[in-house]
């Protein structure tokens, strides 16, 4: 595998998609499907189409996209994972916390990650053989060791059970931290940890395309990432930390 070549492929694809999402906001911010707490926009579909078209012309690896999907049988040991618009609900409401997220996965382990925050024009990258960077400048996780001084970033999955027991567990966990943030984008949450803005991002019942790129970037920044309970439909639990807390 040519790590450098594939990082460049992901970077170009992410920038193309991000530019389109920003430049054509009014025409792309059109609801295609709204189901419960989930929403799909024209932006999701058009962004994924653009990314898949570019990557397919540059790489032979199969692609797992959030919108188009793939079954386990269609994928190989190495495959791309694409979230064309992470933070769709934020994008829909004009909240500038969303990103394009692209990863290359080998044996279910993210080896390359690229996240493009098109709202701030910040491109984050990292791999198993390179340092984590933001716009070509090195980034590192924080050195905070205590939750009482740290920031937790988390989210409430679309399918979460809001019963009393689950909510009490959530509250008990929150109380240990100095600050807790819910920002509506797994990609942005993970780069907050990778760049030292937060110490832990954790979420249950999220998906591989939400976190794969962030896992690669955070590890390259000196952090620790654990994917657990990965299912056949690519749902999973995630914990991304500064490796100290």
Question: Can you say where each PLM-predicted feature lies in the sequence?
Answer:
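Residue-level signal for inorganic ion chemistry
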Residues: 17, 21, 44, 55, ...
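Short, Asp-centered acidic motifs that coordinate Mg2+ and/or phosphate
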Residues: 62, 112, 151, 199-200
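Oxyanion/phosphate-interacting regions
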Residues: 1-14, 18-19, 167-175, 188-245
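Short glycine/threonine-rich catalytic loop with a Thr-x-Gly-x-Asp
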Residues: 91-94, 182-187, 206
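Conserved beta-strand segments of alpha/beta enzyme cores
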Residues: 62, 178-179, 224
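N-terminal subdomain of lithium-sensitive/metallo-dependent phosphomonoesterases centered on the IMPase/IPPase/PAP
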Residues: 1-85
